């Protein structure tokens, strides 16, 4: 799974983690998965001229974008209530939903504080694989 920080780092050469993100991606051998809200956050953080690159990244199949169905939104509502004290953002909760649905626990995120707390199905920890 990929969170906003990795995608911004890949698309913004002046971002502090740019070289680290490109190096990680060159060595990564699995599919990348994310959610629409992460793509929206990524585009919002890039200059207007660079935003189309995010859509092209998905179009080329470099990352697969997933969207919740109605039961997925119900699960997200449960998670938003459960983690309300952390004030989670929508993208985080959507990624937790995707992890639970897909069984993928590995995540590339700069948000170690929150993803260190979130649990899949209330039990399993995320495996934060980037940055290391």
What is each of the regions a protein language model found here?
Residues 1-34, 45-56, 121:
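Short, well-structured N-terminal submotif of metal-dependent ribonuclease cores
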Residues 96, 100-132:
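Acidic, PIN/NYN-like endoribonuclease modules and their adjacent C-terminal/linker elements
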Residues 13, 62-83:
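Acidic catalytic patch
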Residues 29-30, 80-86:
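A short glycine/serine-rich beta->alpha loop
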Residues 4, 36, 89-93:
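Conserved glycosyltransferase catalytic-site signature
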């Amino acid at each position: 799974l990929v969170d906003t920080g990795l995608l911004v780092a890949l698309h913004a050469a002046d971002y502090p983690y740019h070289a680290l993100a490109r190096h990680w991606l060159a060595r990564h051998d699995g599919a990348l998965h994310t959610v629409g809200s992460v793509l929206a956050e990524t585009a919002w953080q890039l200059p207007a001229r660079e935003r189309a690159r995010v859509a092209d990244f998905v179009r080329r199949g470099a990352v697969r974008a997933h969207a919740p169905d109605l039961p997925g939104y119900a699960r997200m509502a449960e998670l938003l209530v459960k983690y309300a004290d952390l004030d989670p953002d929508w993208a985080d909760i959507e990624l937790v939903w995707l992890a639970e649905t897909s069984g993928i626990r590995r995540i590339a995120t700069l948000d170690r504080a929150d993803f260190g707390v979130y649990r899949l199905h209330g039990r399993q920890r995320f495996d934060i694989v980037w940055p290391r």
